[in-house]
């Protein structure tokens, strides 16, 4: 069965201003083997939506379904496990551990999810080779370029073989050349039947996706699927 992620009538508002909906009645289904971009101006709800999709935040109304399983946002412990098992998350800020080498940064994410050191290092070596960084495995973050560091962030997201990869403005700190290389790697992951979702303010990179979702003031205003 192919993986899917479905939003039903999903809304979000914060306690400080309950009359303002950061997300307003979002309905959509994300399917495996496809890449989705979320575009919209600052404050449109992109990051809030990604945080709910990855179970970091919770909606005020509506629900989230992963592979026919409705998420109970009150069960924090279970959701932490679901996030670890199903999701790989890439942030704009790479947040690499400065005292860890490239391979250690990747393997640490595997160990944190219950893998042995030996297994994590073995998988990390394969990932570094796949990302074209085999010869940078012993380098520390300060010795890596911005593009290399962001590829390590991809590797860290991949080590637990996630079904869903979510990235929030992942190329925001990269120049155009490195950003293009980053998105080439990211988009290639869909061949492994994953769901890839990323938010960006850059229309060029948004248009690389199979489907582009536009958020305006918390509402899903348009859906443009590549034919």
Model segments located where?
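Helix-to-loop junction immediately C-terminal to a conserved catalytic motif
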Residues: 54
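Conserved ABC transporter NBD signature motif
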Residues: 62-73
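ABC ATPase NBD coupling module
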Residues: 71-88, 191
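Short coil-to-helix segment of the ABC ATPase nucleotide-binding domain corresponding to the Q-loop/switch region
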Residues: 100-108
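Conserved ABC ATPase signature
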Residues: 140-144, 148-150
């Amino acid at each position: 069965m192919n993986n899917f992620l479905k939003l039903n009538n999903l809304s979000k508002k914060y306690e400080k201003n309950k009359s303002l909906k950061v997300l307003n009645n979002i309905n959509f289904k994300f399917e495996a083997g496809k890449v989705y971009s979320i575009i919209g101006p600052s404050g449109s709800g992109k990051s809030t939506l990604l945080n709910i999709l990855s179970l970091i935040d919770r909606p005020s109304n509506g629900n989230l379904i992963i592979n026919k399983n409705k998420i109970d946002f009150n069960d924090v412990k279970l959701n932490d496990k679901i996030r670890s098992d199903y999701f790989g998350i890439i942030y704009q800020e790479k947040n690499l551990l400065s005292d860890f080498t490239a391979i250690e940064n990747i393997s640490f994410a595997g160990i944190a999810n219950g893998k042995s050191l030996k297994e994590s290092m073995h998988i990390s070596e394969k990932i570094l080779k796949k990302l074209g960084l085999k010869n940078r495995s012993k380098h520390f973050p300060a010795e890596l370029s911005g593009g290399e560091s962001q590829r390590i962030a991809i590797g860290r997201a991949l080590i637990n073989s996630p079904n869903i990869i979510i990235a929030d403005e992942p190329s925001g700190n990269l120049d155009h050349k490195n950003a293009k290389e980053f998105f080439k790697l990211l988009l290639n992951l869909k061949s492994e039947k994953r769901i890839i979702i990323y938010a960006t303010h850059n229309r060029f990179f948004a248009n690389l996706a199979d489907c582009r979702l536009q958020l305006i003031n918390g509402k899903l205003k348009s859906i443009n699927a590549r034919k």
